[in-house]
Design a protein with these regions (language model features):
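Intramembrane alpha-helical segments
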Residues: 100-170
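Interfacial loop-to-transmembrane junctions
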Residues: 99, 221, 259-290
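Transmembrane alpha-helical segments that form the membrane-embedded catalytic/substrate-channel core
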Residues: 65-73, 135-143, 184-201, 234, ...
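Cytosolic, membrane-interface loops and tails of multi-pass inner-membrane proteins
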Residues: 2-18, 77-98, 194-221
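Small-residue-rich segments of transmembrane alpha-helices in multi-pass membrane proteins
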Residues: 37-40, 91-94, 110, 154-170, ...
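Juxtamembrane boundary at the C-terminal end of a transmembrane helix
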Residues: 293-304
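Multi-pass membrane catalytic core of lipid/isoprenoid biosynthesis enzymes
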Residues: 87-127, 217-241
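Membrane-embedded alpha-helical segments that form the functional core of polytopic membrane enzymes
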Residues: 37-41, 45-79, 87, 111, ...
Length: 304
């Protein structure tokens, strides 16, 4: 078995040694912020004329609480395995700066608070989708990572639901616009996380996670899925234009950015290096916010 992190590593690399700082670190607020951006875009695109500001803030707050709870439960479940990975061994739980019990209790409280808050402040449909998102992430996806390489596909489902929550908060229905946004997020996550799995395949192997890059060491399956899923993403990204969620400027952006994303995937499949996997990963990080920003901007122009 791979040993836990040496004491010298833990002393020098732990970013927050105090209790409050460690708890905040466990919340993964940067990732929560990214989730809230997609939620806001769903809310904005679902709004007919003007933003209902109180409802928007209530939706973002409830969604943020649920996201924090999901991350806490995920880390509580994976504590022992995170100790084995270089990338995760200095997190609050593997270093015992936050106990597993505290993380579990905190995560469950966030689940109850976030779901209840959305039920009252937004609507029951949004609360149900939010609660389902947490359950899929923490109860289904997290343990599945140790047993099946399909975990990436399953994990993309909860990752795709926040923009749908934004849409349902204002529309109170599963409209085509919200489903299209969820589809874009779903297919974006697949090349994004497969690139990450290729970058850290040795680390995932140490942790015992059955990522596709671990179960297929040649990488052939990863490269094939990256190309196919990125192609599907480019096609799905045209739907907001077809359903009049955005206009021609967005369409041009979707095709240009999608083409560049696909080129990064093709480059990875040919070169098969960690550097090209990293390039695809960072391309995905640029692609999504640009796409969503132009979508929102073009929607504003379309309905002026």
């Amino acid at each position: 078995m791979t040993p836990a992190a040496p004491a010298s590593l833990l002393k020098n690399d732990i970013p927050n040694s105090n209790a409050i700082g460690s708890f905040v670190e466990m919340m993964k607020l940067k990732m929560v912020f990214h989730i809230l951006i997609t939620t806001f875009v769903g809310f904005y695109l679902g709004s007919k004329v003007e933003l209902e500001m109180p409802l928007m803030w209530h939706t973002l707050l409830g969604t943020g609480i649920l996201a924090i709870g999901a991350f806490a439960l995920n880390q509580a479940i994976e504590k022992d395995f995170d100790k084995l990975m270089v990338r995760t061994r200095t997190r609050p739980l593997p270093t015992d700066r936050v106990s597993r019990t505290a993380a579990f209790v905190f995560g469950l409280l966030c689940f109850a608070a976030g779901t209840g808050y959305l039920w009252v402040a937004a609507n029951p449909l949004t609360a149900i989708i939010g609660g389902l998102t947490l359950v899929l992430y923490a109860v289904v996806y997290t343990p599945m990572k140790r047993y099946s390489s399909l975990n990436t596909l399953v994990g993309a489902i909860p990752g795709a639901l926040p923009p749908l929550m934004g849409w349902t908060a204002v529309q109170n229905n599963l409209g085509m616009g919200g489903l299209v946004l969820a589809a874009i997020l779903f297919f974006w996550q697949l090349p994004h996380f497969l690139a990450l799995a290729l970058m850290y395949k040795d680390d995932y192997r140490l942790g015992g996670f059955q990522m596709l890059s671990v179960t297929d060491p040649s990488g052939e399956a990863c490269y094939r899925h990256i190309i196919v899923q990125t192609l599907i993403l480019v096609l799905v990204s045209v739907f907001p234009f077809l359903f009049r969620l955005a206009g021609p400027w967005y369409l041009a952006c979707a095709l240009i950015c999608g083409g560049y994303f696909l080129l990064a995937g093709v480059t990875l499949s040919r070169r098969r290096t960690r550097e090209s996997a990293r390039a695809l990963f960072f391309t995905s990080l640029i692609y999504l916010p640009v796409l969503l920003l132009v979508m929102a901007w073009d929607k504003a122009i379309l309905f002026v």
